[in-house]
Each structure stands twice: as structure tokens, then as C-alpha cells.
Amino acid sequence: MATPAAVNPPEMASDIPGSVALPVAPMAATGQVRMAGAMPARGGKRRSGMDFDDEDGEGPSKFSRENHSEIERRRRNKMTQYITELSDMVPTCSALARKPDKLTILRMAVSHMKSMRGTGNKSTDGAYKPSFLTEQELKHLILEAADGFLFVVAAETGRVIYVSDSVTPVLNQPQSEWFGSTLYEQVHPDDVEKLREQLCTSENSMTGRILDLKTGTVKKEGQQSSMRMCMGSRRSFICRMRCGNAPLDHLPLNRITTMRKRFRNGLGPVKEGEAQYAVVHCTGYIKAWPPAGMTIPEEDADVGQGSKYCLVAIGRLQVTSSPVCMDMSGMSVPTEFLSRHNSDGIITFVDPRCISVIGYQPQDLLGKDILEFCHPEDQSHLRESFQQVVKLKGQVLSVMYRFRTKNREWLLIRTSSFTFQNPYSDEIEYVICTNTNVKQLQQQQAELEVHQRDGLSSYDLSQVPVPNLPAGVHEAGKSVEKADAIFSQERDPRFAEMFAGISASEKKMMSSASASGSQQIYSQGSPFPAGHSGKAFSSSVVHVPGVNDIQSSSSTGQNISQISRQLNQGQVAWTGSRPPFPGQPSKTQSSAFGIGSSHPYPADPSSYSPLSSPAASSPSGNAYPSLANRTPGFAESGQSGGQFQGRPSEVWSQWQSQHHGQQSGEQHSHQQPGQTEVFQDMLPMPGDPTQGTGNYNIEDFADLGMFPPFSE
């Protein structure tokens, strides 16, 4: 039996607002109707609830969501600001070309903090130190290499916490004078404020204009100032520190000590009663005090006075810009000094060498006109020179004038001056002068020349060591007893000792007539050396005495006369001073040797040649002329032809007929100014190809070194 709801389902469904009537099956329709009726009921309730929220609760919910977004935005902005400040405070981050990301900034900040606390490299701590060195030895080596001293001062108060014992050789102050004092007491009064700024770790009035090296622009310090003043930032400054005046005799006088003394005196001499200061370059870092993991005793707690930071630095003597006498002059006493003037001649700088040159201290000359020290008669000249050097603009101008020294004496000074121009504005900045004491400079130059002359005069030429040669062996291979017998400057006028050292093998080639040492060999200045001429000339052509020295034919006499005139222009003669030979005639003869009837030479020509003995040196044939028929062309008409034994006259006539044509045709073709060419003209005479090779006999030349024997 159907229920009333099921009797009219479409009608019931149509009564429900929002429902849709569908033609469905009865059973399905009943279920559909129930579902459809339930869903609108829920939807109506939800709408009513939403309507209530819109009316009553929509405002607070929207406000809470907006408030939450604003909080998150402000939080992100604050975090970005803090990370930006952290990036500025960490040196590794600020040194980057572009801004790093947040993670990189945090990582670098952690690394920087670890490095400051000393916990960043625990694994490698001490690995740099050699195993054989203790901590104290390593500290001394480091300080000695740095040539400085280590000191630690409190940042807030400047109290000295620690100073190394190397302060004693650097500043001549004992270590005890630094302990218990402040660093402000050790520096010059004018440098206290600069030191206070370097020790300060908080923001102060230092924030000013800085130069950006990357862009080249000048800008104000902003966040970089906090980075410069933060803990762990580097410090580097120059100040004047007080030096002790106690002599330190126990220190060794070495190069380092001399350099320290020179640098300490770089600021000039100290007046009596004033403290001496040295320029010290301090480099270090601001560190946390006390260090991490370190506790200080109670008695030392008041030293830091509750300080949180300290300066750990090394102080080293700074090389001063003032020139020092020993640096700029090698002399023991300087002769010049530098000065700088403005365009009006006012002295603005003087180097300390003026003390030794003119007697004034540098501070006595500063701010004064150079004309005040010039002689009245030279003032106009000096004034004109300064005006001229200003017009020259860079060119050097020298002037000499009289300068009044401190002891009221007039000193002749030479000043070489030139101007320095500003490269940007092309304006003259100042005038640089080099002032030289002329008299003292001349004295030093004279002393130097005397010293050089003394050094040359003490050099004995007679004691020059000779290279070690075999005993008694001459450079040409001949055996002599005294190496300098031939080349001696002081020699017997008749050259008696020239044949004293000849060996027995050479004596076989000499005749008995040449054994007398009192004979004159040749005239002085002869182009052919006397005696062993083959040894005197180290050329490839060997001079054979007796063949090359004396010729007797008229044709060869003319030839020799022409050669002699050519050789006399560039002849080789003895350079030593010898007394003139008695009876020496004037050189007006046509012969090269000037042997005439009035000459004191003996009539026997065999005394002139060691090869004149027919048994020892005459070859079989016409290789050598017999010299038997000498003509007046040789200027020896008073001699007979029978003096040369064993050389028939037909040999000479045959040689003359064969060689006269060739000699007359070639007498101008091979003549050279040198002596070697004469030998080349004469030596082919014995071995002319027209004579045939049969004229030579090797056995006849057994005693001559120029024809070594060989076995066929």
C-alpha cells in the first residue's frame, strides 16, 4: 500500500523550494526525493550561517589575515637588514665584487667568528711550527725576522698588557719601562689623538669622506665605518715612539744594529733636554680580551680594567724619507747637500748633510731666504739665476757664489737647480737645488788622483810574471838560457849577449868568424832584426840569415834598394833606447843595410851569416848565390870575389841570367809595406820552378827547422 508521499511524488517534490521534478521510477523516485529534500535543507542552513558570518565575523577574520602578512613582511625586512649589516661587518663579504646571497653571508660570518676566537683551525693548529723549535724560540725568530717588537694594549684605556723583550734593541728602552704604563705615554704628544682613534672600537666622529678605490669616487663613510671599527678589523698606522738614551754596549755592532741606529736618527739630531723619538710602523688587529678559553688572574684583572678588546700589533722602525749622509755619498765627509726652495728662494727643506758642509742645522735654515747667506756681491747674480731657472721650467742651471757658513767664513758653493712642475696644473711647485762645496770636492778629487797614481807607480813592469814555459825554451822553439836577453831594454851596444845562449846545434851553422861577440851585426833601426831573426818574427815565413840579408848583383841591388825605401816607412825596429853605434853613416846609400867601404864592418861577408860556411850550409847547385861578384851597386867595391870559397862564379852568372828578367818584371807586383812580403820575394829565389826540383837537397837543410825531414 502506497504511502501518501509516494502517491503524489511530483507534487511533493514541487512544493520543496529548489527541487526539480524528474520522471523517475516510483522506488527510485522515493529515494531521490528524500535525498533531494535533505540537501536543500543543509544548503539553507549553510547559507544562513554564511550570512551570519558576513554580518558579524567577516571583519575580524580579514583583519587577522592582513595582520599576519604584515608581520611576516616586517620580519623579512628586519632579517634582510641584519644580514646586510652582517655582510658589511665581515671583511670577506665586503671585499666581494657583488653582494652575496644570505646563505653565503652567514657562512662567511661563522668562519670569521671562528677565526677570531681561534677555533677555526684546531685540526692544523701548530702544524706550521717545526718540531725542533720551542714556542719561545719561534717567537724570537719571528720578531728578529720582522726586526720589531710585539705589544698588546687595551683598546679602551691604552694600558700595556704585554710587550716583547725585543723592544730593547729597537727603541733602546728596557721592557720594564713599558709595563705599567700606557701607550699614550710612549708616543709623541702630537700623535696621541691619532692613536686614540686607532684604538677606538665604537662609532665616533671619524666617519668622514673616503676614496672608493674601485670607482675612484669620493663618498661618505656609511656602514663601512662600522666594519673598520669592529672587532677583528686590521689596524695599520705610523706614529713616533719615545726612544731610550741608555747606551747598550752588550748588543753586537752588526748591520741590523747600524740600520736601527740610522733609522732612529732619521728625524734629525735631538736638542739637549728633549726626548728622542723614532718613527714606528704598527700593524695588527683588534682582538677580544681575554681570549676564548683563557682566564686571567685576579691580580692582572685590573690591568685590562674590564676591557673587552685589545690591540695586538708589531712595531717596526720605519725607513724615514730624510736622506742620510752615508746613504747618498760614498765619501767619509759629504761635499754636497740638497735643498728645496719656493719660487722666491725661501728654503722649505734641507737634508742633514748640510751640517757637515756648511755647519748649520736643518732647522736653522728652514723658512729663510737663501740670499741671507749669500755674499753681498753675489746676491744679484744668485737672484737672477733663480729667476732664470723658473723660466727654464725643468732645465738645470748652475751658479757659483760665496756662502756664509756658521763660523762666519765665506765658502765657495756651486748650486745646480731645477724646478718641479705639477703635472696637472703645469705650475711650478718648488725649486730643487744641489749645493756642492767646490774646494772640498776638488781636494777629494786630487786625493783620489794621487791614490791612483800611487797605485800605478807601485806596479813594477819588470816583475810581471812570465807564463811558465819549459826551462830555456824560447817562443820560437829555440833553446835559450835567458828569456829576456833579446828583449831587454838595457842591452850592450854591440849586442854581445845575443849569441851567448845559442845551442850547439846552431853553432854548427855559424862560421868561426861570427864567434866574436864584439862585432857589430847591423845598423840601428834596421828593418831586419839582428842575430836570430827567425825567432824574432813569429810568422809563417822563416828568415834565413845570409840569404835574405845580403845580395850582390846589380839587379837585385836595385830591387833591394826599392824594397828598403818602402820598408823604411813602416819598418820594425827596436823600441828601446840604445846608444848610437860608432861610425854609423847616414842612410843615403841605395842598399838596405848601408854597407860601404868606409863602414867598420869586416870585409869577410861570412861573418854576417851563420849559413856562409860551404861545408855546412851551401846546397849543391845554384840554389844560393855565391855573392862572389859584387858590383858597386851594393856599395862594397873594395872587397874581392875570392872570399866566398866553394861557390864558383859561374853559378852566380847562371842564376843571374835566369832570374834577372823575372825579377825586373815582378819587382813592383808583390811589394807590400810589411816585412813578410820581402821574405816572400826572396825565398822563392832558391826554389824557382825554372831551376827544377833537383836543385833542392833535403840533406843540405838538415839543421834548419823549416824543412823537417821525412822518409819517402
From Swiss-Prot:
<dbReference type="GO" id="GO:0007420">
    <property type="term" value="P:brain development"/>
</dbReference>
<keyword id="KW-0677">Repeat</keyword>
<keyword id="KW-0488">Methylation</keyword>
<feature type="modified residue" description="Omega-N-methylarginine">
    <location>
        <position position="42"/>
    </location>
</feature>
<feature type="domain" description="PAC">
    <location>
        <begin position="398"/>
        <end position="441"/>
    </location>
</feature>
<dbReference type="Pfam" id="PF00989">
    <property type="entry name" value="PAS"/>
</dbReference>
<dbReference type="InterPro" id="IPR011598">
    <property type="entry name" value="bHLH_dom"/>
</dbReference>
<keyword id="KW-0539">Nucleus</keyword>
<dbReference type="GO" id="GO:0007417">
    <property type="term" value="P:central nervous system development"/>
</dbReference>
<dbReference type="GO" id="GO:0001701">
    <property type="term" value="P:in utero embryonic development"/>
</dbReference>
<dbReference type="Pfam" id="PF00010">
    <property type="entry name" value="HLH"/>
</dbReference>
<dbReference type="InterPro" id="IPR013767">
    <property type="entry name" value="PAS_fold"/>
</dbReference>
<keyword id="KW-0804">Transcription</keyword>
<feature type="region of interest" description="Disordered">
    <location>
        <begin position="573"/>
        <end position="712"/>
    </location>
</feature>
<dbReference type="GO" id="GO:0017162">
    <property type="term" value="F:aryl hydrocarbon receptor binding"/>
</dbReference>
<feature type="compositionally biased region" description="Low complexity">
    <location>
        <begin position="653"/>
        <end position="675"/>
    </location>
</feature>
<dbReference type="GO" id="GO:0043066">
    <property type="term" value="P:negative regulation of apoptotic process"/>
</dbReference>
<dbReference type="GO" id="GO:0005737">
    <property type="term" value="C:cytoplasm"/>
</dbReference>
<dbReference type="GO" id="GO:0005634">
    <property type="term" value="C:nucleus"/>
</dbReference>
<dbReference type="GO" id="GO:0003700">
    <property type="term" value="F:DNA-binding transcription factor activity"/>
</dbReference>
<dbReference type="GO" id="GO:0044877">
    <property type="term" value="F:protein-containing complex binding"/>
</dbReference>
<feature type="domain" description="PAS 1">
    <location>
        <begin position="134"/>
        <end position="209"/>
    </location>
</feature>
<dbReference type="GO" id="GO:0005667">
    <property type="term" value="C:transcription regulator complex"/>
</dbReference>
<dbReference type="GO" id="GO:0009636">
    <property type="term" value="P:response to toxic substance"/>
</dbReference>
<dbReference type="GO" id="GO:0046982">
    <property type="term" value="F:protein heterodimerization activity"/>
</dbReference>
<dbReference type="InterPro" id="IPR050933">
    <property type="entry name" value="Circadian_TF"/>
</dbReference>
<dbReference type="GO" id="GO:0005654">
    <property type="term" value="C:nucleoplasm"/>
</dbReference>
<dbReference type="GO" id="GO:0000978">
    <property type="term" value="F:RNA polymerase II cis-regulatory region sequence-specific DNA binding"/>
</dbReference>
<dbReference type="GO" id="GO:0006355">
    <property type="term" value="P:regulation of DNA-templated transcription"/>
</dbReference>
<feature type="domain" description="PAS 2">
    <location>
        <begin position="323"/>
        <end position="393"/>
    </location>
</feature>
<dbReference type="GO" id="GO:0045893">
    <property type="term" value="P:positive regulation of DNA-templated transcription"/>
</dbReference>
<dbReference type="GO" id="GO:0045944">
    <property type="term" value="P:positive regulation of transcription by RNA polymerase II"/>
</dbReference>
<comment type="function">
    <text>Transcription factor that plays a role in the development of the hypothalamo-pituitary axis, postnatal brain growth, and visual and renal function. Specifically recognizes the xenobiotic response element (XRE).</text>
</comment>
<dbReference type="GO" id="GO:0009410">
    <property type="term" value="P:response to xenobiotic stimulus"/>
</dbReference>
<feature type="domain" description="bHLH">
    <location>
        <begin position="63"/>
        <end position="116"/>
    </location>
</feature>
<comment type="subunit">
    <text>Efficient DNA binding requires dimerization with another bHLH protein. Heterodimer with NPAS4 or SIM1. Heterodimer with the aryl hydrocarbon receptor (AHR) or the SIM1 protein. Interacts with TACC3.</text>
</comment>
<feature type="compositionally biased region" description="Low complexity">
    <location>
        <begin position="597"/>
        <end position="626"/>
    </location>
</feature>
<protein>
    <recommendedName>
        <fullName>Aryl hydrocarbon receptor nuclear translocator 2</fullName>
    </recommendedName>
</protein>
<dbReference type="GO" id="GO:0007165">
    <property type="term" value="P:signal transduction"/>
</dbReference>
<keyword id="KW-0805">Transcription regulation</keyword>
<dbReference type="InterPro" id="IPR035965">
    <property type="entry name" value="PAS-like_dom_sf"/>
</dbReference>
<keyword id="KW-0238">DNA-binding</keyword>
